[in-house]
Amino acid sequence: GCNVQTVAAQDVQDGRFPTVASPNPENPPALAMAIEQADASGADIVIATDPDADRMGVAVRGEDGKMHLLTGNQIGSLLAWYRCMSMSELGIINDSNRSRAVMVKTFVTTGLQDAIGHHCGYEVVNVLTGFKYIAQKLGKYEEAIPAEKRRDYRRMSEEQTRALRLQYSRYFVFGGEESYGYLAQDFVRDKDANSAAIIFAELAAYAESAGKSLLELLHELFEKFGVYLEMGKSLVMEGADGAAKIAALSASYSANPPAELDGVPVSGIRDFSKGDMVDVEGDPIPAEKMIFVDLADGRSFAVRPSGTEPKIKYYLFGHGKPGEPVKEALPKVQALSLIHI
């Protein structure tokens, strides 16, 4: 079993959340007290959620004895790998039903999860940013089950609904987004930190039983599929003038897409604002002010205005070669990820 500790000062219910500047596990300072306690007690893992338990952040102890914060992309990739591996080892997903297994993620989430899903023989569906789009897919998969079979769907056990989905529809194995939101089941149709924390603890126990650290598991994924690194940048522009600048800047990428960046030719552009795209299942992708730019050297970036804040957001992606030792690949991919916008 696990020796579970909590941070006593953060156990007190207080809507002001006085122990942190922001109770958001995306922000490293939100985990500072827990990491300090982990160092004092010798704990190997820190798991933190936000107050409404939809986002989850994690820190793990490395071979150097220090705690390392994982990104939302890295946490999601470890969870995706563990789910896929478990489904195969338990015989739930096999050659007879593998074509019905699916992962659903957002376009701006790491390609490592695409690689993991495809390696396992699953369909990987990319959707727009926002968990509502993942939830829409889950609703679609439920509706594909014959009506007479799903009449009591909401009262069925996971085993019963899974059998129906594997026979008539799609079985959702894992989904998530880079902003620390994950989902591994169908009965909650939003990002769910509660179930994610349980699965991550199970993953940690698996790693311990295999004599590996979680960082070692992550590096094994990097060596198998290539090192994936992602970065995020935001430009904040407040007020009416700021909103106009954000709109103009966003529109400029569609009207005048770049031909090169950092002296590297652009190899492909995906403009989501036109509303003429479909996903791998043939479903229309709603028009969104987002553009994806792929460079000839393997880098790519996406640009989109935030839907909730006065900022324009950049998502930067770098990918190394499969099979390359992580220690050699990491510096190269880190350099590739530093796109100068």
Model-predicted segments: where are they?
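Short helix-loop-beta junction
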Residues: G1-V7, A115-C120
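N-terminal small/polar loop signature for handling phosphorylated ligands or for N-terminal nucleophile
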Residues: N3-R55
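Short gly/pro/ser/thr-enriched loop/turn and capping motifs at secondary-structure boundaries
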Residues: D11-G15, R55, I75-L78, F131-Q136
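Phosphate-binding and adjacent anionic-ligand microenvironments
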Residues: D39, A43-I45, T49, K66-H68, ...
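A generic beta-sheet turn/junction motif
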Residues: P51, G307-E309
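Short Gly/Thr/Asp-enriched flexible loops that form oxyanion-binding sites at enzyme active sites
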Residues: D54-N73, Q113
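C-terminal charged capping/lid subdomain of soluble metabolic enzymes
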Residues: E309-F317
